[in-house]
């Protein structure tokens, strides 16, 4: 599952190679649940790092080792803002 914010971010991403790498990484998550380079950022939200170009990030909520929702994406330059946005999105969803 993914949010409209995540869809919007991915649609606006102009770097097609980066978009392909991000989608492939998400697909791997869905198939074998191997998170790879990933860290908790608070409130049960995790940051998936895609080490390519700008250092893309995907923020998601995970329960019992399974990704349940893709919240938002960004890159290294907007990391702190994206983490706060992901937390806000999650708070709205769980209400």
Regions flagged by a language model, labelled:
Residues 1-54, 64-68, 76-95:
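Basic, Lys/Arg-enriched alpha-helical interface segments
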Residues 57-61:
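Short beta-strand motif preference
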């Amino acid at each position: 599952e993914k949010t409209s914010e995540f869809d919007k971010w991915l649609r606006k991403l102009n770097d097609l190679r980066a978009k392909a790498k991000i989608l492939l990484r998400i697909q791997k998550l869905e198939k074998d649940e191997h998170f790879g380079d990933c860290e908790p950022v608070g409130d049960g939200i995790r940051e998936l790092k895609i080490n390519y170009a700008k250092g893309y990030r995907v923020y998601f909520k995970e329960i019992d080792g399974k990704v349940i929702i893709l919240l938002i994406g960004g890159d290294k330059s907007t990391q702190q803002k994206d983490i706060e946005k992901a937390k806000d999105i999650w708070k709205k969803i769980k209400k």
